[in-house]
Regions:
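Short, low-complexity intrinsically disordered segments enriched in A/P/G/S/L with frequent Arg
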Residues: 7-12
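Active-site-adjacent loop/helix segments that line or gate small-molecule/cofactor pockets in enzymes
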Residues: 15-48, 95, 209
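PLP-dependent aspartate aminotransferase-fold enzymes
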Residues: 105-227
């Protein structure tokens, strides 16, 4: 936790202590504007938030895609209460607990391929991305491919707020103030309003944009590229569905050139 001292000025003394909004630095928010006209959610049930003034707000993004079964679902609430009353926390460093192994087995039972054999749990999307990048680089080193150190992302992509995710992500404003990872490049985005503005489902236009990965391969050589990362569905940059055949073509190119493919997926499951 980092606490920054205010450069000057006084707190808004008219605000009750229980309503003091000064101390929380909110991510991806215009803090001054928010605190001048706060939107405070007090409860949630089903698909709605309830503000402190009792106004209902439709949650169109399922709590940043974390509550796809709805808010305050009774079975989920009961499961959380039961587990907290039995074992609230157990580290996974040199010890474990039965439900962790059970959850991993359950997840693999949903897998479309027997190639998936292991699950590594993380605490957030940002941590997941940085962990996936580290696993990819470590895997290439472990199998003797020591020159495979280049990571490839896409323009306009969002991969969280860790240094790895910002580096492979394609949002310039997120990179503006930071020194990023070396050995990172990007293919073009599939976002094109002129071609896909009113598409329903997967757009018909844009599969050929997957071929831009060949440009990166020609630039560096496949023997230097460790992994390609993409969002199957780009959420925070517009809920953009990939063109028909795009992901299949990306998969084929990566397989052909011995490049790992990372799907950063938190929305469609």
């Amino acid at each position: 936790m980092i606490i920054l001292k205010r450069a000057g000025g006084s707190r808004r003394s008219h605000m009750k202590e229980s309503q003091n909004l000064e101390n929380l630095w909110m991510p991806f928010s215009a803090n001054r504007s928010f605190k001048a006209r706060p939107r405070l959610m007090n409860e949630a049930k089903g698909m709605y938030y309830k503000k402190v003034d009792e106004t209902l707000v439709l949650d169109g993004t399922s709590g940043l895609w974390c509550c796809n079964a709805g808010h305050n679902h009774p079975k989920i609430v009961q499961a959380i209460q039961n587990q907290a009353g039995k074992l609230d926390y157990a580290p996974s460093f040199q010890m474990g607990h039965p439900l962790g192994f059970k959850a991993a087995e359950k997840l693999l039972s949903f897998s479309p391929s027997s190639d998936f054999q292991y699950v590594f749990f993380t605490n957030s999307g940002s941590e997941s991305v940085d962990t996936a990048l580290k696993i990819a680089l470590g895997y290439q080193q472990h199998r003797g491919k020591k020159d495979k150190t280049i990571l490839v992302g896409r323009e306009r992509a969002y991969h969280g707020v860790g240094f790895g995710g910002i580096s492979v992500g394609g949002l310039p404003l997120n990179k503006k103030h930071f020194s990023l990872l070396d050995n990172v490049d990007h293919v073009v985005t599939t976002h094109n309003l002129e071609k896909n503005a009113f598409s329903r489902g997967e757009p018909e236009w844009g599969c050929e944009l997957a071929d831009d990965l060949y440009r990166i391969i020609e630039k560096y050589g496949a023997d230097r590229i460790a992994a390609f990362i993409t969002e199957p569905l780009a959420g925070s940059t517009g809920v953009l569905i990939p063109p028909k055949g795009y992901l299949k073509k990306i998969r084929e190119i990566c397989t052909e050139h011995d490049i790992l493919l990372i799907f950063d997926e938190v929305i469609t499951g």
